[in-house]
Regions:
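ABC ATPase nucleotide-binding domain signature region
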Residues: 6-75
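Conserved catalytic loops of ABC-family nucleotide-binding domains
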Residues: 10, 41, 127, 141-173
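Short coil-to-helix "N-cap" segments within the ABC nucleotide-binding domain's helical subdomain
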Residues: 71-92
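Conserved ABC nucleotide-binding domain
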Residues: 86-112
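Hydrophobic anchor residue at the start of the ABC signature
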Residues: 119-120
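Catalytic Walker B motif of ABC-type/P-loop ATPase nucleotide-binding domains
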Residues: 131-136
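Conserved beta-strand-loop-alpha-helix hinge in the C-terminal portion
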Residues: 175-176, 183-214
């Protein structure tokens, strides 16, 4: 019998970073927004920083294992990363891993785009409910960015993960972002649907004002 996985409507949020109400600490904005909408308890997230945020003196593989591979898949201090990557269901994530070839290389020896990509892959690999990314399009070629976007869409629709983005160039994300997040001077958030993805006959309002959870 085939195991049919339930697909979810993607949730990919782009923060309007052009607004001065959003600070330089984008991670703080992401977390505050989630708390603002009523999320209780700990927030299970992975974060790809504007700068790569990697362990420079470790290899690509060691970075993946340290933060992304579950400890149950690491046996006797020897990683099982090849087995893990081969069994990934996200084909686009597999493609991104393949682009970080020669994973025994040290991060400090990588080119700028490679370092950025390793940080993005590590974030997607992590088993988290939320994916936070600060400028994931920065230093990334159009070809690679297309694969990153496909990987994020897959994670959101197949694995029910919510993706939050602050883009270096927001226009590069208009084809996959489902919602815009804005913030007024009082700190109130507004969530708006990306009308480019809305159905033409949809007559419902595209703007939802979010009140702070009590």
């Amino acid at each position: 019998m085939t195991d049919l996985k339930v697909l979810h409507s993607p949730e990919i949020y782009l923060f309007n970073s052009e607004q001065r109400q959003f600070g330089a600490n984008v991670l703080k904005d992401f977390l505050y927004y989630i708390k603002f909408t009523g999320k209780k308890g700990l927030i299970n997230f992975s974060f790809s920083a504007n700068e790569d945020g990697l362990h420079q003196n470790l290899s690509i593989k060691e970075n993946y294992i340290l933060d992304a591979v579950p400890s149950s898949l690491i046996k006797n201090s020897e990683d099982n990363f090849i087995h893990t990557s081969e069994n990934l269901t996200n084909p686009h994530l597999k493609d991104l891993i393949a682009r970080t070839n020669c994973i025994e290389r040290l991060v400090k020896d990588l080119e700028r785009e490679e370092r950025k990509l390793v940080g993005i892959v590590k974030t997607i690999l992590s088993n988290s409910e939320y994916i936070f990314m600060d400028s994931p399009d920065k230093f990334i070629s159009p070809e690679t960015l297309a694969i990153i976007k496909a990987a994020l869409e897959y994670e959101s629709s197949h694995n029910n993960r919510k993706v939050f983005l602050k883009a270096a160039t927001k226009e590069r994300w208009l084809d996959i972002v489902t919602h815009w997040i804005s913030k007024d001077e009082s700190g109130r958030f507004t969530k708006s649907k990306n009308q480019l993805l809305s159905k033409p006959n949809n007559q419902t309002s595209n703007v939802v004002e979010l009140k702070k959870a009590s």
